[in-house]
């Protein structure tokens, strides 16, 4: 996302600069749009006045968005930084899929809004462009576009956060999926940890066979060792079968050679256990070894799913 991300952030900051100049102020420690947010968010009002705070380094979704300070409460009714971090962490794996050039700007305009004298929401067309590009990727993981980001909530003709002219978004849409998204993962220790935290279960697994079934890939394990059981009951472990959702016809190169052990992560959707990430279990790989060390002591944030 490199250049596109910074260009998008620059557009957002240009808007911010213009609005700040109009308000004859250079920086707001306390901003004055409490009643506006309350009116927009179903009449909800907050006990503390909105304030500008630094975007912390561990708010991975927005730390490098291009500006350094944000408003709390944010535009999704999160009143504390702990709540923002918990909810935002579930979006980091999607951001890494690069499904749309505007994903980070759109999400951060809500999770970590730039400090202005009134709330500025993302443009409806930006929401629709990100949704249309990213929801097909989300569906591989058993997710749909969440109610809290419903695009008709956002302004159409008013001042709003935009990164490019509306007709330029078409060029940034992916031209079809080449690799099954759960198989297209960066082999970096931090990225694997993020996937682990966003997944409900994790297993070390030897795979017996892979079949096509009803548009999915069906993965039959041979041997498995739980690293994180989550919703899997011990009695279910013996007969466990995994599915790569909508993956019947997209390649997953890790599954081309089943002689290795794998790190498999996933989540339960209804009665199915879906694969959300797969890596070759490679102790010789430096990044994988780093992940193994971090995993022993790493505490994932606990959060209620924002996708329900």
UniProtKB/Swiss-Prot annotation:
Domain of life according to the entry: Eukaryota
Q: Which residues form a coiled coil?
A: none
> SMART domains this protein is in?
C345C, FRI
All copies of the NTR domain together span 180-300
Q: Which UniProt keywords apply?
A: Developmental protein, Differentiation, Disulfide bond, Glycoprotein, Secreted, Signal, Wnt signaling pathway
Q: Specify the glycosylation sites in chain numbering.
A: 167
**CDD domains this protein is in?**
CRD_SFRP1, NTR_Sfrp1_like
In Pfam terms, one family for this protein is Fz
**Predominant location category:** secreted
Subcellular localization is given as: Secreted
Tissue localization of expression: Highest levels in aortic endothelium, heart, spleen and eye. Lower levels in lung, brain and kidney. Weak expression in liver, skeletal muscle and the medial layer of the aorta. In the cortical brain, localized to neurons and small blood vessels. In the retina, localized to the inner and outer nuclear layers with high expression in the neuronal cell bodies. In the heart, restricted to myocytes. In lung, highest expression found in the epithelium of terminal bronchioles.
The record's disulfide annotation reads: 52-115, 62-108, 99-134, 123-160, 127-151, 180-250, 183-252, 197-300
Signal sequence span is 1-25
Q: Which GO terms describe its biological process?
A: actin cytoskeleton organization; canonical Wnt signaling pathway; cell differentiation; non-canonical Wnt signaling pathway; positive regulation of cell-matrix adhesion; positive regulation of focal adhesion assembly; positive regulation of stress fiber assembly; regulation of angiogenesis
- Which SUPFAM superfamilies does this entry report, sorted A to Z? Frizzled cysteine-rich domain, TIMP-like
FZ domain location: 47-163
Gene Ontology molecular-function annotations? frizzled binding; Wnt-protein binding
Q: Which GO terms describe its cellular component?
A: extracellular space; plasma membrane
**Protein purpose:** Soluble frizzled-related proteins (sFRPS) function as modulators of Wnt signaling through direct interaction with Wnts. They have a role in regulating cell growth and differentiation in specific cell types. SFRP1 decreases intracellular beta-catenin levels. Has antiproliferative effects on vascular cells, in vitro and in vivo, and can induce, in vivo, an angiogenic response. In vascular cell cycle, delays the G1 phase and entry into the S phase. In kidney development, inhibits tubule formation and bud growth in metanephroi. Inhibits WNT1/WNT4-mediated TCF-dependent transcription.
Q: What is known of its domains?
A: The FZ domain is involved in binding with Wnt ligands.
Q: How does it assemble?
A: Interacts with WNT1, WNT2, WNT4, WNT8, MYOC and FRZD6.
Into which family does the record put it? Belongs to the secreted frizzled-related protein (sFRP) family.
The name of this protein is Secreted frizzled-related protein 1
Name of the gene this protein is made from: SFRP1
